[in-house]
Amino acid sequence: MRGVIPNYHHSYTLLFFVILVLFPHVFSTNTLSPNEALTISSNKTLVSPGDVFELGFFKTTTRNSPDGTDRWYLGIWYKTTSGHRTYVWVANRDNALHNSMGTLKISHASLVLLDHSNTPVWSTNFTGVAHLPVTAELLANGNFVLRDSKTTALDRFMWQSFDYPVDTLLPEMKLGRNRNGSGNEKILTSWKSPTDPSSGDYSFILETEGFLHEFYLLNNEFKVYRTGPWNGVRFNGIPKMQNWSYIDNSFIDNNKEVAYSFQVNNNHNIHTRFRMSSTGYLQVITWTKTVPQRNMFWSFPEDTCDLYKVCGPYAYCDMHTSPTCNCIKGFVPKNAGRWDLRDMSGGCVRSSKLSCGEGDGFLRMSQMKLPETSEAVVDKRIGLKECREKCVRDCNCTGYANMDIMNGGSGCVMWTGELDDMRKYNAGGQDLYLKVAAASLVPS
């Protein structure tokens, strides 16, 4: 009697498909080799180690397309199983694909995105020397990189998406620029709308000229908000940064680059990103894998006093006074009539002229957002006492402060023009010393 021979082939095939359906991440990859391609039709994606980020194609709604067709983009998003998909990077934001046809592949040591007619719509355009073969890789931190076969260092890339931010700053990304002029300036630029990733009206950019560096939020070319200068611990105009216990802020200022970045410390379950929204707010957003709902941790401009130059020169904004704009002691409204009508943008003027000598004094204002630094000079070698003496000798000096607040304070910042865009905080601000006429120091 012949026995029954089990059909193991069909059993293994069935088991394979069960595993594929239940555990798709087991078969996911984070690399793209020269003989591979990602296409819209294949619906294939790259998934980062740790399953946090995913790279692939996505489309926006047809109402954003003048010709009524779908617009397709190559992007990176958080890989979550529920909720609204959150995009953190878009390759071809200003050059969409149409007709549901697009291909990403490696060609001549560069990543190239081709449309339906095999015309490039986006490319990394690498022009250096590369050792073939070249591989593209989506890293655990969300950085999409291109590296050659002889690169052994984990942080050496031919090209990386972190050098080309869109509207989102992730941990380990940088905003700023190289001092030698090489590379692009790294800024955040909003989407045109919540469903249109093309370049929008708002940007967040680091001022890298001179010795003091601060971020500006711009609406096209118009300044909307200023963070205040970096003071060794945080940006002076963001006191709440001192309460960001799980975020390590880093500011790099050397002969190679000027840049800001951050990392999330001690709790890798928390995911954090900075986002320049299409409505004009710089947002700090957090979420966890266990609770995928997004939490708006912080957003600015936060209030009226955050608005750029809302009170004009020689005036400061205080959310705890009415009106919120106040002339500095020793100054009066430049236009009293407009001031009474709550139009305070003209600011204030001195009630008594400076004598440019020993007759002048200094008014200490505590918990302040320091004035705009475009008219400031810096001397890192001296402290506050020497800074005061230097300001006394300079008839153009209008005020001074410490450059760095660490270890009791160091460095000298001295203003030689109008003092503008100031505000007073309850806590977390900085001491500012304003030069005033002796008559203004007499108790009223």
Swiss-Prot record:
Residues 1-28 form the signal peptide. It comes from the Eukaryota. Disulfide bonds join C387-C412, C395-C397. SMART domains: B_lectin (SM00108), PAN_AP (SM00473). The keyword Cell membrane does not apply. It holds the Pfam family PAN_2. PROSITE patterns: BULB_LECTIN (PS50927), PAN (PS50948). The keyword Signal applies. InterPro entries: Bulb-type_lectin_dom, Bulb-type_lectin_dom_sf, Pan_app, S_locus_glycoprot_dom, SLSG/EP1. Residues 31-159 form the Bulb-type lectin domain. Stigma. Keywords: Disulfide bond, Glycoprotein, Self-incompatibility, Signal. Residues 356-437 form the PAN domain. Involved in sporophytic self-incompatibility system (the inability of flowering plants to achieve self-fertilization). This is S-locus-specific glycoprotein BS29-1. It comes from Brassica oleracea var. alboglabra (Chinese kale).
